[in-house]
């Protein structure tokens, strides 16, 4: 049981280190969740689907790495040679350390390849586990050199015990695979390096017993041809130090990165490797200071040794100088945390199946998200009030669309020649608006506006209301021939005829054009229909219906304007010199005013339209009051009623400022019900006391005298009924 717990703890620490490297580690919940999936033997595709929410673009990279580790664990447990090995080399793929040492051994020179990921399991006998980092470089020959233990220049890595495992614990050794992209994660690779061979990185836990590293078969390691290939190595280690590994080459030595800056190391190396050593001295000093500033305890570190050579002497340098001094790579620090122990006894702990089920259901609910459609881009167009009639809306939209026309100066063909996407979009909107309105060609010609008129829009008050119009797709195109002179005059006439229907935005007053223009005010024109009540709107439009109803279906000007207005408009269009007189323009504005109806406004004196109301508002007092027979319909002023809205008199001759409620009509006289056909009406009713009277007795109304229905067929007594308390029987008290 302790072996499985230790293996699970090692896998979890490796997963946590990988998540920290990818920047996806937040708390302990994600590693726990991944361990649950490992325990459930989820496939790589299932893990990729479940972890995509947390890891994003790094999901595939993480799952490939995790399944590679699990595959190595399975191969180790099934391989008898790994079980017989006295000790293992433990490597960590993504949890670097600060303490490192370089061991030396036998190796051959092969084609360069990234070291494979190997996992081995054994039981170390000593409680004093040590961490060592070995980095090898391959040379051109297979000459073996013995390492002198007594030499003063010998570099031996000192390792401190990081933990003391139990004697029966399993130890996991993890080495980087090609999928780990360790070259991308280690940032200390110099760009101008001339050497194409990459060093191998090995992290090992050592003990007093020899350890065997387990590698993948050679067939699976020959994928890339520009990297190194490693052979299984036999490492023997002393109780306090590691046995040095021999490297091929002449006088080649690998120095521990953590001791490169010590004085005795510098004294022995600087004479031989001074041109290369001094280049990287500053970088190593900076890295040494960075490691000293670490606040959290460090588990392990990855060290990369880089070779340097000149352009013309690459082969000679490899043989003569051997391994060059490298610099420290970047490292990831992980605090060593004790294993979490449950605070509750096993009998009181929650069922693991329920926890796994809840986690799976939560994951399913998170992944099943709703895909909302993209919000379409919208466009706002200023328009007049929303309560216009359909003909008025058509007229306003035509003018608004033509006002935007000068900004879209080139037509469709010219836009395509220029290739301007913005102008194409605006031209498409204009054509779609015109095609949606379905305007006659003659009307379109008369409604064309010029740039000069577009600059004159500031003389009309602005309207802040607008409606939302979705951007339409390109539909049928309508090519409009510009006619600036007629468009200017048409717009002026339309502003006069429908000034109360069309409101545009304020613009800066531009330079005055040379052509004559008419400044028309809106004095005396009724308010827009949006400010009226429903009754007033019906009253106003009774006198404003167009005469020619058949032409109104064309949605043009003829269906909206009266014959007199059309006549004046045509005269203005035919006048080329602009000599349309102001007198005729005044006649035109007067002609559009509806005549007052000889009917008193029922909202007076609280009518909101004031003088613009088409109904009569009394001014002079009534001379026949109070004997006026017209009452509230009188065209003259009557005094105010003191009861106002509370007045219940239907024919009250006084004026009521507030709107009164429905007046109850007087209840008609109740007619006695007719006798039924099968019996005569009882002559003694309602005083008849005979219980078995064969004559007709009408039923009493349940509401009695409180009944308000004038056509009620039930009997209503004419005498008053005693109150309820008088009809209550009380038992008389008997004297004792």
Swiss-Prot record:
Residues that bear Phosphoserine: 85, 240, 309, 327, 343, 390, 409, 498, 515, 527, 620
Subcellular location: Nucleus speckle
Cross-link (Glycyl lysine isopeptide (Lys-Gly) (interchain with G-Cter in SUMO2)): 99, 139, 175, 198, 245, 283, 295, 357, 378, 413, 489
Species of provenance: Rattus norvegicus
Record protein name field: Zinc finger CCCH domain-containing protein 14
Keyword Zinc part of the UniProt annotation: yes
Gene3D superfamilies given in the database record: 4.10.1000.30, 4.10.1000.40, PWI domain
PROSITE patterns named in the record: ZF_C3H1
Gene: Zc3h14
């Amino acid at each position: 049981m302790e072996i499985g717990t230790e293996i699970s703890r090692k896998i979890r620490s490796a997963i946590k280190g990988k998540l920290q490297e990818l920047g996806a580690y937040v708390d302990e919940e994600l590693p726990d969740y991944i361990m649950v999936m490992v325990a459930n033997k989820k496939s790589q595709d299932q893990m990729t689907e479940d972890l995509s929410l947390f890891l994003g673009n790094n999901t595939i990279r993480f799952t490939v790495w995790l399944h590679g580790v699990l595959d190595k664990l399975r191969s180790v447990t099934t391989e008898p040679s790994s079980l017989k090995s006295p000790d293992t080399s433990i490597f960590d793929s993504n949890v670097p350390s600060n303490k490192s040492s370089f061991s030396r051994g036998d190796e051959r020179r092969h084609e360069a390849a990234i070291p494979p990921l190997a996992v081995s399991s054994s039981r170390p006998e000593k409680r004093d586990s040590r961490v060592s980092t070995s980095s090898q470089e391959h040379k051109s020959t297979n000459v073996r050199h013995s390492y002198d233990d007594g030499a003063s220049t010998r570099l031996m890595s000192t390792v401190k015990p990081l933990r003391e495992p139990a004697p029966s614990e399993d130890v996991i050794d993890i080495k980087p695979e090609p999928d780990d992209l360790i070259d991308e994660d280690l940032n200390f690779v110099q760009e101008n390096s001339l050497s194409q061979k990459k060093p191998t990185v090995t992290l090992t836990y050592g003990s007093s017993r020899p350890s065997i590293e387990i590698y993948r078969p050679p067939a699976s390691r020959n994928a890339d041809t520009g990297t190194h290939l490693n052979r299984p190595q036999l490492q023997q280690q002393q109780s306090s130090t590691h046995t040095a590994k021999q490297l091929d080459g002449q006088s080649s030595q690998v120095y521990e990165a953590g001791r490169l800056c010590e004085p005795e190391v510098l004294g022995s190396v600087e004479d031989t490797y001074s041109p290369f050593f001094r280049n990287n001295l500053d970088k190593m000093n900076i890295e040494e200071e960075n490691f000293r500033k670490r606040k959290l305890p460090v588990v392990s570190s990855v060290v990369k040794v880089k070779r340097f050579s000149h352009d013309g002497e690459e082969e000679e340098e490899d043989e003569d100088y051997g391994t060059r001094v490298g610099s420290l790579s970047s490292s990831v620090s992980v605090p060593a945390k004790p294993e979490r122990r449950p605070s509750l006894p096993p009998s009181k702990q929650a069922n693991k199946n329920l926890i796994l089920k809840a986690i799976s259901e939560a994951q399913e609910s998170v992944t099943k998200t709703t895909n909302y459609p993209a919000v379409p881009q919208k466009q706002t167009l200023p328009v007049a009030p929303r309560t216009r009639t359909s003909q008025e809306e058509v007229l306003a939209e035509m003018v608004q669309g033509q006002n935007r026309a000068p900004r879209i100066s080139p037509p469709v063909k010219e836009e395509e020649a220029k290739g301007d996407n913005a102008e194409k979009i605006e031209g498409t909107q204009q054509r779609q608006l015109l095609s949606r309105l379905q305007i006659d060609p003659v009307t379109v010609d008369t409604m064309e506006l010029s740039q000069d008129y577009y600059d004159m829009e500031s003389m009309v008050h602005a309207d802040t209301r607008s409606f939302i119009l979705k951007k339409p797709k390109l539909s049928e195109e309508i090519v409009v021939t510009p006619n600036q002179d007629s468009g200017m005059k048409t717009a002026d006439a339309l502003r006069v005829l429908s000034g109360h229907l069309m409101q545009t935005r304020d613009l800066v007053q531009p330079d005055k054009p040379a052509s004559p223009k008419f400044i028309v005010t809106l004095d005396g024109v009724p308010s827009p229909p949006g400010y009226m009540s429903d009754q007033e709107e019906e009253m106003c439009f009774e006198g404003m219906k167009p005469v020619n109803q058949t032409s109104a279906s064309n949605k043009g000007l003829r269906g909206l304007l009266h014959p007199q207005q059309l006549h004046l408009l045509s005269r203005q269009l035919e006048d080329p010199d602009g000599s349309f007189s102001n007198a005729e323009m005044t006649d035109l504005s007067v002609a559009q005013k509806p005549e007052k109806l000889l009917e008193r406004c029922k909202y007076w004196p609280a009518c909101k339209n004031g003088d613009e109301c088409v109904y009569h508002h009394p001014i002079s007092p009534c001379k026949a009051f109070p004997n006026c027979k017209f009452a509230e319909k009188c065209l003259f002023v009557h005094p105010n009623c003191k009861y106002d809205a509370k007045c219940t008199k239907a024919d009250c001759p006084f004026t009521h400022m507030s709107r009164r409620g429905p007046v109850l009509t007087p209840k008609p006289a109740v007619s006695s019900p007719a006798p039924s056909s099968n019996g005569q009406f009882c002559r003694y009713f309602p005083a008849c006391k005979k219980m078995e009277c064969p004559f007709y007795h009408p039923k009493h109304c349940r509401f009695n005298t409180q009944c308000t229905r004038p056509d009620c067929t039930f009997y209503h007594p004419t005498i008053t009924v005693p109150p309820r308390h008088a009809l209550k029987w009380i038992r008389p008290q008997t004297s004792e």
